[in-house]
Amino acid sequence: MKTYALPESDYFLSGHASCPGCAVALGVRFVLKGLGPKSVVVVPPSCIAVMAGPMPLSSMRVPVFQTAFETTAAAASGLARAYKALGEDVTVACLAGDGGTYDIGIQALSGAAERNEDILYVCFDNEAYQNTGNQKSSATPWGARTTSTPRGKATRKKDIMEIMAAHRIPYAATACPGYPDDLVGKVEKARAIRGTRFINVLSPCVPGWGIPDDRSLRLARLAVESRAWPLYEVEEGLRYTLTREPAGIPVAEYLRAQQRYAHLTDADVAEIQAEVDRRWQQLIRRTGEQS
């Protein structure tokens, strides 16, 4: 994938209510750069809803439609159809968290994907219900400590990318704010495609992950370089393409930098490494590249 020059215009304003060092806030800024001014965003309850601000105030320079947890993709589908009926060329994008995507909103998202609604759905995955106090979601990885899994989560993270790929939507991709050219480029690419598009953005959470407020981007890069969060695209549910070749550093470098994994034993870390390696080899087979 080519390197993109970041657009100069900003559509996310200062003065919003995010935590210092919030990767979601930076991710939203980059996504809005890729969307541009001819866009409307649909936001369910989440950290993003808090950042967007209470009506009539807004931290975004594009129209914002705040909806219920369960209805993000459904509301966006209606808006997209309305703009099409009016003959207006507007990108309708969903900006949601993992709780509103992997869990509460998955029924509406699956329905929209099955109908191939003309929406761009962006999930900011901070791997827990962070806006309500760091409870586990189905996006929380195995072993991660949350307020509802104080000994570490006992089940695996849901594979939302494979779920979306199984719908055979035109475009799905992973991204993270640690590589802004990759993220903005994928948003721009998705914006030019018709039908349901999905981008999953890893978004380290400062309080939830137990990291200093100047480390969220470092953690995002460690996730990519350790292959815990590979950057890739899936087109039509079949064509897998890596967009960055990771360094392949030990996953321990990523895990040990977070308090939510401080309780893990060396055996636990080795088990996670084995799972990361297994998933990486599976991805490599699908891309047809050499590991």
Predicted regions span which residues?
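Short gly/pro/ser/thr-enriched loop/turn and capping motifs at secondary-structure boundaries
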Residues: 48-49, 126-131, 206-208
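Conserved thiamine diphosphate
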Residues: 2-6, 88, 137-193
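Flexible, low-complexity linker and terminal segments
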Residues: 205-291
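Cofactor-binding active-site loop characterized by glycine-rich and histidine/acidic residues
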Residues: 2-121, 134, 139-141, 150-154
